[in-house]
Amino acid sequence: MLQVQAVHRDEKQAVKLKKTTYLPYLFNLVLPKMFYPNRIVVARLYTDVHEHDKQAAEYFEGFQTPCFEVPASLFPGEAPLDKIVFMPTVMLPMGFEAGGVFGPGVLPRRSYPIDLMASGHKGQTPPLFVGLRSLYVQLPSGIESFLDTVVDNAAGQDALVYGSCQPGNHPSKGEQSKELMHSNDCSLSIAYNLPAPPTPPSPYPFPPLPVQYNIYTPDLSNVHMLMLQQRNPTVALLSTVNHPHVPAVAFATMGDEECPKFELPSDIFPICEGVNRPIFLPRRFLPKGFDAGCVFKPASLPKLWFVKHIGGFNRPQPQHNNAITPPLFVGKISLVVGAHHLAKELQRQGEQKAQSEGAEGGSLKVVEPNGGFIPVTQGFMVMETEQQTPPRGAYSLESYQEASEKGCVVRAIKDEAIEATDTLLSKLASKPEDMQKKYLSCFKVDSDIDLMAEAMADMGTAEMSLLAKRETLPGVDGPRALDQLRQVVEDRSQIRSHTDQLIQDHIYRMDRNRMLALRQPFAPWFGCGTIERK
């Protein structure tokens, strides 16, 4: 979906609907409210979802349909704007006073709006909807009440709720029989989190950084899966709010720790390779009662898959980003316990804990944060520099003890072994104390890798070592991790130097061509005696 500048339209502006080969029924298409300030909206359509309504096209042929002037600046190239088919009002999405569609293959690839079509898309261009919103939007009462309920539930969590099925649209018995998730091969479960104690306010006034989805490995050891029927495998929607990414779990999956694996049913799950492949978790990070399990990161599975298999049969989970599909857990059960017995067990554990606390103090105690959770690493690399000002993307530290408290695991210092001769040592001894002082700078774990490589390149010959002890990094191969980090930094430095060389070569060629153009000789033209450049 794309948003552009506002467009003004006359109320009586209309056009006659001609015979067309693509006219979908888009009344049930709901677009986010975040695009209401700018009235014109562009959205990509899918032919398998938004099919051509042949009966409606024949019925409305010759009718007057509302239209507006489509801005040419919306398309990167010269697009055939006259081929848009404006739709009747009853077929437009809710909240739109006019709109039209470009059929499949009507827009050329060079004229299709940027970011609405994948770079590797093959075949004809997908259909495109261009609509003009109404100034006053009136939604049905059912949808209004549903949106109000969702907003009230998510107001205290500062997150969005993912919902892929419209309220009130329950599938029929024929559609339920087609649901693969309700077959005898696998079951659908709900991820239930034990109530966590309140956390103290953060001492940092800065806003939280945006969530990354390049890798997603949550800690599910404190999560219980509740299900009516237990079958292998079982699937459950996860929440990026309740089940955040934990770097320690990612380190464990990349280390030597065993991650039990199993084969996913090919008739249910699509083939995901590369960065979208499922990540199998170590046994100690799995939910209780599971032998093996894997996690699909957010946006790795297509939305149509969720709508077809899970959309109408699972409660929504709070997500940080509602524009992409949520993460999914697929596990293999080892402990067969009914949902009722599991709930009773949870209740019994809570009562025992309350009785033990009451017997010790005789009164209610202030709930303190539980230190058993794996902390999220704040720092990553501490660097020794001779400049007091820290490099770009880093901040200053006072000592290595503070770096350890921040969670730094890698140390980078300047390798002065080659320069450490007697002459140089005498020169260093003669320098003032301020010149010999070293300053510490810290890069966070989510800092830009290019800024790290640039800072290490400014140091010259740098040496990296592990600052953290082996006990604090269980299951991590330290030398191997350092080699991988060193290789990444060297690759970024080579890319940067190669780019600089290409720019210098381009500047040299431009200067050379300009000088050659200025050195062309002048000669008089015998026709009129004027000077002509040869």
UniProtKB/Swiss-Prot annotation:
InterPro entries for the chain: DM7
Top-rank lineage group of the source organism: Eukaryota
The keyword Repeat is annotated on this UniProt entry: yes
UniProt keywords, alphabetically: Repeat
Similarity field: Belongs to the DM7 family.
Name of the protein this chain belongs to: DM7 family protein GE17491
